[in-house]
Amino acid sequence: MEPTIKRIDDSYSVSAQLALSDLQALAALGFRSVVCNRPDHEGGPEQPEQGAMQQAAQALGLKFAYLPVQTTGATPEQAQQLRALLSELPRPVLAYCRTGNRSSTLYEVATQGTRTVRPFDVVVVGGGSAGISVTASLLKRDPSLRIAVIEPSTEHYYQPAWTLVAGGAYDVNDTVRPTREVMPKGAEWIKASLSAFAPQRKVVLLSDGSELGYQQLIVCPGLQLAWEKIEGLEDALGKHGVTSNYRHDLAPYTWELVRSLRGGKALFTQPGMPIKCAGAPQKALYLSCDHWRKQGVLEAISVEFNLAGAALFGVPTFVPPLMKYVEAYKAQLAFQSNLVKVDGPNKTAWFDVTGADGQVTRVEKRFDMLHVVPPQQAPDVIRRSELADSAGWFEVDPATLQHPRYPEIFAAGDVCGTSNAKTAAAVRKQVVVVADNLVALRKGAVLPKRYDGYGSCPLTVEKGKVILAEFGYGGKLLPTFPMNPTVPRKSAWFLKATLLPWFYWQGMLKGREWLTDCKPD
């Protein structure tokens, strides 16, 4: 397995602790020099000593340098030493320490002043739902703001509709638009990736080696789908009956599989939380089963839902009405059953099942159709940053969405280390909290808004009916409409399939703030 590498710029990348066996992969990737920033013996006997690493590197034709940095941080002398090394070592260079953080910080300090910093009032990291929406909301409040939006992708997706695509109820082409069309007028689109934060200097470093300065920073890059954590999955996706509604190009394949399956075994999976739209894994099951029932083939299909957790849904109020559909579709629930391996050609999946005694057993299951929801985590650049919490998500106050140590930094969307559901509905309310609080901060005023943890999950229990689950922190019900939220309704389907997509493109992304009031306790 190749080491996980974070590219800082064209000539310099960083990595967590390397093994001796990683050096051959680095040479194959084109690196010409390796710098070790981790002191010998810091990680105990399992950490390769720099002498052994140097010998192995030189045998592969790689230059090697040892510049140990303590966990307390780099000194000015060490920054000067790195500058000297960089003038001598052939590039590109790969530096490593325990996590990569010290190597990133040392490089940032060593190259400080050598690059021009472009100044902005506000820098927004990410051009997804949260990034575009909060930028539009800020410009509505103050059109004079100089805002940069960092987003490498040229396409912008409306992801909540992919479930409908997989159920034959939506055109996949209607879920994507060019990023240039949704970028708010007045904002500058920076087509690059974020490489590192330098919060002490109020600067972010980009993949092209440039730097952007900010007075305020909003971090909303979304989350990262960790397909690689399930052995064999990446090679199997899109063929052999293996699919996922978490990818734009695979949602149509799900519908193809559903239409063609007339009998056999259909497995649906849900990884450990948190994930984006926690109801999406079971939505795939419900819409598939509804189609099979209407086609008269459900009795010939064995349906099983494998959940890594111990509950069907995180808010207990909605479990009874959902269980009625599980029973009606004759789906079997397998709790504490986590997908760990897939063999597509042989249509076999393996699950780690945790028993009541805590013992884990590896269970093999055959399938004709396998719908996979991948494990999910914060992006690498967040997890390796000092701005992350202990779980790797972006650290914010759950009410103000402000970073606890850097008050000029806010966050919104899936990247936040908050306990709310990671949904577009949550973003709709978060961006107003962030926009109002950021503007107040710029004026030296008290932050006026508090986020209540609102999130919404329109559970598509059958084609044409939805249970509209709306809730906040602690599972508190926060219904928008004065109706029993546990009842499946046609009106909620119309909201999900017609009104919300229209509002997303014409409302949220344009700074129109409808139904955004929060009700914190």
Give, region by region, the residue ranges found by the protein language model:
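Cys-dependent protein tyrosine phosphatase-like superfamily
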Residues: 1-93, 105-117
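A Rossmann-like FAD-binding core segment of flavoenzymes
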Residues: 144, 187-196, 201-204, 212, ...
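Short, well-ordered coil/turn residues at beta-beta hairpins
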Residues: 36-37, 207, 220-221, 373-374, ...
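Beta1-alpha1 glycine-rich phosphate/pyrophosphate-binding loop at the start
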Residues: 118-188, 272-316
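A conserved FAD-binding loop/helix module that cradles the flavin
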Residues: 412-461
